[in-house]
Amino acid sequence: MKAASAAAALRLEDIPNIGPSIADDLRALDIFEPAQLRGQDPYELYRLSNLRAGAEQDPCLCDTFIAAVRFMEGGPARPWWYYTDERKRELGKKK
């Protein structure tokens, strides 16, 4: 069962939208505990994940990073696709 609040998230997999695969992606970025997501830039996490993978990954990964960071900073649990429009705007600015 997923955590209802940031305080209840003890493992990365407790965070809404985070399953084993994305938890592994976060661990590859040296994020091992949910609290480490507080204050992180999800767009930078996505950029670093792409560098590590050697290719641009599915942009939905960025949406998931946004959802996870926002949740751990006290925001509501939202599905990752809630952040798709925001990500498109933000990444569009950087091009």
Model-derived segments and spans:
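Residue-level recognition of specific faces of alpha-helices
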Residues: 11-14, 25, 36
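Sterile Alpha Motif
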Residues: 1-18, 42-95
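Catalytic DNA-binding helix-loop module of base-excision-repair DNA glycosylases/AP lyases
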Residues: 21-30
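ATP/adenylate-binding site constellation spanning eukaryotic-like Ser/Thr protein kinases
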Residues: 31, 39-42
